[in-house]
């Protein structure tokens, strides 16, 4: 995610900040651009605004007020009047500054992959350096169960004695919303093995949250099942590819079908694990992924000895115009067993965003800084949010 610091600032006195809160806006179906905006007003009066859960803007107090009015669709003349009174500047100056802010946000909405720094005069802030009251994203492992036939030791099921119920997961989603977390990703194990996945997506949708699913894609090959997830509000998905299985490619075709039928620009990414068996075909697999309509690619290696070939594969993905996704958790599977994670973790530095930009919730509600980082910060169901967030250190 891009993380930016907005330089917008009215030249008047500093007014009393807005009350802390969390606000969202989703464009209506008739709008030509399918977009969502979220604004979290921090206790300091500064704010965090996300555009489609991908571009993150760190806003100063006055820019936060502009974002608040932009999301609430306040008429521009009323915005100018309020800003003029609060910051003791002329109404004309306030109107001009708000119009400039609105133009920049509209450009981010309407122009895919626009660099806000280069084109919109935003200032970039170093990732993960801002003090936040909550992360940008919550990764929820609904279950550590895997499809029949998967090796039992592939997931860390021994450390999780139970799974939360549907009602309990809804409480977790509601707590995330109350904390101001705009984005939830359901992972596992295999999240589609939970019969309540669509119901949980719908609860998040009702709260205005952006949702994603990371899955092996087997069940999504059934276009009717995928349609239930899309109807429930699914915004994006990452398919963990099993190249030797036809269902993997069928699931991508299923997304392409509904994207065309529904005229829905759902964002699809794919994860590909390089193994000794597929290393020689990796470029051909990447080409096939690119042709399927996938918008981004996540790559990993099952063996450290493959790292040089992995870098070459990343270069090939760039040539195929497939942006790389780095920070989404890859579900535990036969290709990504917990044993591989534990081996890779030895001597490895914790990802910079873990415990800051995102948190990871296990099937029993325990909160970790990130997948595979076995430091329990608390339990999302049992503990207060403030206690969990403070425990991250």
Language model: regions and residue ranges:
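Short, acidic, Ser/Thr-enriched surface-loop or helix-capping motifs
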Residues: 361-362
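Radical SAM/AdoMet-radical enzyme domain recognition
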Residues: 137, 155, 166-187, 194-306
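C-terminal accessory region of radical SAM enzymes
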Residues: 310-341, 366-393
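Short, small/polar residue-rich loop motifs at catalytic or cofactor-binding pockets
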Residues: 352-356, 374
């Amino acid at each position: 995610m891009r993380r930016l610091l907005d330089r917008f600032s009215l030249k008047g006195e500093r007014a009393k900040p807005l009350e802390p809160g969390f606000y969202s806006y989703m464009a209506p179906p008739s709008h030509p651009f399918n977009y969502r905006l979220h604004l979290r007003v921090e206790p300091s009066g500064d704010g965090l605004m996300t555009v489609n859960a991908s571009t993150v803007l760190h806003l100063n107090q006055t820019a936060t007020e502009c974002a608040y009015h932009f999301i609430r669709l306040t008429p521009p003349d009323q915005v100018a009047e309020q800003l003029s009174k609060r910051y003791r500047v002329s109404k004309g100056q306030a109107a001009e500054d708000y119009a400039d802010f609105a133009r920049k946000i509209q450009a981010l909405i309407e122009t895919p992959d626009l660099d806000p720094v280069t084109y919109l005069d935003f200032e970039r802030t170093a990732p993960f350096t801002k003090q936040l009251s909550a992360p940008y994203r919550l990764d929820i492992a609904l279950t550590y169960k895997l499809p029949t036939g998967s090796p039992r030791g592939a997931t860390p099921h021994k450390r999780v004695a139970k799974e939360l119920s549907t009602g309990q997961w809804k409480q977790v989603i509601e707590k995330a919303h109350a904390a101001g977390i705009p984005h939830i990703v359901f992972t596992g194990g295999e999240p589609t093995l939970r019969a309540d996945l669509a119901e949980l997506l719908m609860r998040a949708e009702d709260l205005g949250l952006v949702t994603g699913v990371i899955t092996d894609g087997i069940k999504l090959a059934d276009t009717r099942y995928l349609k239930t997830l899309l109807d429930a509000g699914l915004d994006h998905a990452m398919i963990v590819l099993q190249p030797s299985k036809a269902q993997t490619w069928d699931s991508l075709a299923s997304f392409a079908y509904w994207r065309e039928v529904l005229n829905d620009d759902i964002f699809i990414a794919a994860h590909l694990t390089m193994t000794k068996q597929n290393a020689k075909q990796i470029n051909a697999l990447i080409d096939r992924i690119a042709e399927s309509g996938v918008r981004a690619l996540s790559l990993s290696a099952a063996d450290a000895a493959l790292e040089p070939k992995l870098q070459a594969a990343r270069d090939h993905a760039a040539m195929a115009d497939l942006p790389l996704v780095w920070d989404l958790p890859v579900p535990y599977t036969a290709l990504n067993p917990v044993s591989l994670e534990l081996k890779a973790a030895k001597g490895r530095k914790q990802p910079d965003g873990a415990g800051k930009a995102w948190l990871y919730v296990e099937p029993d509600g325990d909160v970790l800084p990130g997948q595979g980082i076995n430091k329990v910060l608390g339990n999302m169901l049992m503990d207060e949010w403030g206690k969990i967030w403070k425990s991250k250190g």
